[in-house]
């Protein structure tokens, strides 16, 4: 399913920021800075993009995403090849923002995949929209963490521009969740309802509390933490968002399959009706010959 493959690829590109942030804050340089998790997340992004390529022709949209991701990785790699003391805070900030840009380049792909899905069954628009909104929410959640990583790396409270970007991102998360949460809590599917509760518990309450507490520490001049330690603590809180997104995608696929089966049943019934009409005509023809 193209929609799921593109959502997965966009999520992998977004999730790659976690180990990237940790690596940028690590004292090691060169190959030592690129631990197994860092390498595995890059491979996962590449594999997900390859899966999209195999599904169908996405043309320039896929190429643009891959080029943007490659450019962002080059910025990251240039910094990782230097000792940590030589990684200028502004350069770290630019590298993280370049990774933001890589995710943004996935939007045309998502538009194309969603349009194709709805062409198959327009009634799936509700579930498809929620799944996409959850992808956006997962990315915004990760950006909140990345904004704090920038301040941690610079060992100073967020500057006004950084604070504004943080608050804007936080606002988007808080705007999305009531819309998504209402859809999850009112679902007839127990898996979606339970996954929604997990997001409320693990991220809205737990993850946001950790983010707000970390921001307060930075504002108070407490820099006794590292990008790696903060990333290690915050990333598990994002898992619930991904699971809820997957639950909606699974439901969308089931509805699509059910719709196709319904269409196949309708086709069979139509064929039987045609055969019955032909049989009646044949019987009438034979009866007419006998008269």
Predicted features and spans:
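Hydrophobic alpha-helical segments
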Residues: 1-291
